Amino acid sequence: MIRSDVERTLDFYVRMCSLSVTAESLAGLGLLLAGGGICPATGERLLSPDTVRVVKTIMLTCGMYDGSGTFAVQVGIPSKSGVGGGILSVVDRRMGIGIFGPALDGKGNSVAGERVLRHLSQQLHLHIFDTDSQTD
C-alpha cells in the first residue's frame, strides 16, 4: 500500500520510467549490486548490504513482470526489465549485465534480451542455483 500523495508518487514513477540509460550504464549498476553495494571504481559503499539483498531478491522474484517465475527457473539471474527493451541483470560477486532489445514479448520483456541471458546462463553456469555457479 502506498502511503504518500498520489500525485507526487505518480510524478516520481513517471520520472523514473523516463530515465535514459545505456547497456553500459545498466551493466554498471548491475556490477554495483553484484559487488554488494560497493562501487568497483572507488571502493566506496553506496548501498547497504540489506538494501542490496532486498533489491536482488525483488529482481529475482518480480523483475521480469508476469514472466518472473519462468525466467527464474530457466535463467536464474536476478534481472529487471523495462518496457523500453532494457534488462539489468546481476551475477553475484561476478558481473553486471546490461542488454537492450526493442522487441517485447506478451509480458513486456525483451525477446532478444531473454534469449541472450538464457544462453549466457547455460554456457557460463550463471544460474543462481546452479552448483557450478559458485566456481570461477
Task: Provide a role label for each language-model segment.
Residues 1-41:
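Active-site-proximal helix/loop microenvironment
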